[in-house]
Amino acid sequence: VGPTGVGKTTTVAKLAAAYSLAAAKGSRPLNVRVITIDNYRIGAKQQIEIYGNIMNIPVSCAETPSDLKALIDMYQDVDIILIDTIGKSPKDYSRIAEMRHFLDAVGQVSDVHLAMSATTKASDMREIMQQYETFGYGSLIITKFDETTCVGNIISALDEKKQSLAY
């Protein structure tokens, strides 16, 4: 989960590739599926589908909470399901609540990560972390490290909120 423009879709694609390729070197390939619930941003579905086609990883689109639940149930035997979520402003409380309702339909989710850009100001990072607490994220994914030379804001925000870094 995370605000708009931080690279959630690209990160999901990178994680899908990493999980499937890393496992291919082992005894058996990991069975990875990607589900997008981003029916809001123009071209979002097509973007993740292109990534999936390139990597030969199935991508599905859930338009409703019940669609998402059905897809999760259908994929219960796969190793990893990655869900590409809608980017929302941390100040858009109604949209965040709507997405929370969407994800609640799934039931127990193993891991929720909050994605944030390394270029985000420390004060904005703290606000984003607070607003997205409703999703029960366990760690952060920091994107766009190549776009900044200062990482103190990230370290400060993680330390203040006692959060760990996943990727």
Show where each model-derived region lies.
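Conserved catalytic-core segment of NTP-binding enzymes
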Residues: 33, 64-73, 80, 90-167
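Conserved lysine of the Walker
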Residues: 8
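Short, aromatic/basic amphipathic alpha-helical patches
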Residues: 47-49, 157
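Switch II (G3) loop of P-loop NTPases
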Residues: 1-4, 29-43, 50-68, 72-98
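Walker A/P-loop NTP-binding motif
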Residues: 16-22
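Short, glycine/polar-rich helix-capping loops at beta-to-alpha or helix-loop-helix junctions
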Residues: 43-45, 152
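Hydrophobic positions on the alpha1 helix immediately C-terminal to the Walker A/P-loop
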Residues: 11, 15, 47
